[in-house]
Amino acid sequence: MGTHVIKMPDIGEGIAQVELVEWFVKVGDIIAEDQVVADVMTDKATVEIPSPVSGKVLALGGQPGEVMAVGSELIRIEVEGSGNHVDVPQAKPAEVPAAPVAAKPEPQKDVKPAAYQASASHEAAPIVPRQPGDKPLASPAVRKRALDAGIELRYVHGSGPAGRILHEDLDAFMSKPQSAAGQTPNGYARRTDSEQVPVIGLRRKIAQRMQDAKRRVAHFSYVEEIDVTALEALRQQLNSKHGDSRGKLTLLPFLVRALVVALRDFPQINATYDDEAQIITRHGAVHVGIATQGDNGLMVPVLRHAEAGSLWANAGEISRLANAARNNKASREELSGSTITLTSLGALGGIVSTPVVNTPEVAIVGVNRMVERPVVIDGQIVVRKMMNLSSSFDHRVVDGMDAALFIQAVRGLLEQPACLFVE
């Protein structure tokens, strides 16, 4: 028997260090050749690290959230043969970019990063019984299941490493009678528990980007009320006539079309700003970022060349991109290169929002909830479908008057939807 050492691979693009996001193995596990053992994250992508050999895991070289240098020891594996071989595997890009975007972090007790974790006997980590008052270890998914089921995790025995509670442990607990499980009845009682969640992986990248955007960009926001009664009637008519054959239309492809048409007269808004080089790049192509909330956080897949797509073509591509982002299947290319971003919370859109500019872009258009409201038209009170657009701009590049005129142009197109299709 011998020892096979895998080192952190060179991801490319001149990257000297990466963040260890998640382990898929633990000390004592038997793994196969090409099995993915960990996810690591660069500034641009989450990358899967496969094992080039099969064997038994002896030691792990870091904790999730730890930043590791390229070439540092990642994992030790006991293998058949002489061993003593140091290997740098080929990293496999995962279909999840890093920013705005990776694996969901798991809560950890205050663990100091170690050179590596190893068992003296090279056996699997033992189950450590929880002492009264200790915070139970469990992944966010397990905690959510327990919360939804009204179960306090301190009553659940964990069979994972260091007493971590697994889905199987929760299933076993839920299969027991309530009295046998020792579950206390729900009531009005004081809670003293708290949870510390490490900011790692995707959440760290989102935090960094949001902080950077708010610190560097001179944000200003503009809100406009829009009567979308005619637009909604057109959308429903098109869906009724063509929905079965072409797919149902949401409001998003109409909003994209309105941006494309309006941007023809406002090239300074379809732009990116390099504030270090002091260069504004005005783009002919309209690449619309579609802000999408997934289980792992916010991602912005990009609808490329929206100016060249028909209403249904753009609708289909928006749907495909959003599904890919939600399922962590979007490629790195599909999540980069936007020139303006559209963000919508749908039915949760609220009345007003102040979205954060997706740098290096200079504008983001936010869509709020559509509601029926009484409005005055020609001296008469009528019920109309109304919706607000809440948009933010980089005031270093976009003047307030230009921003207002741009949103007014979008408003005119949405209120008179026939104009969307007049060249």
Swiss-Prot record:
Its cofactor is (R)-lipoate. GO terms for cellular component: cytoplasm. Binds 1 lipoyl cofactor covalently. The active site is at 395, 399. It catalyses: N(6)-[(R)-dihydrolipoyl]-L-lysyl-[protein] + 2-methylpropanoyl-CoA = N(6)-[(R)-S(8)-2-methylpropanoyldihydrolipoyl]-L-lysyl-[protein] + CoA. Transmembrane segments: none annotated. The branched-chain alpha-keto dehydrogenase complex catalyzes the overall conversion of alpha-keto acids to acyl-CoA and CO(2). It contains multiple copies of three enzymatic components: branched-chain alpha-keto acid decarboxylase (E1), lipoamide acyltransferase (E2) and lipoamide dehydrogenase (E3). Belongs to the 2-oxoacid dehydrogenase family. Forms a 24-polypeptide structural core with octahedral symmetry. This is Lipoamide acyltransferase component of branched-chain alpha-keto acid dehydrogenase complex.
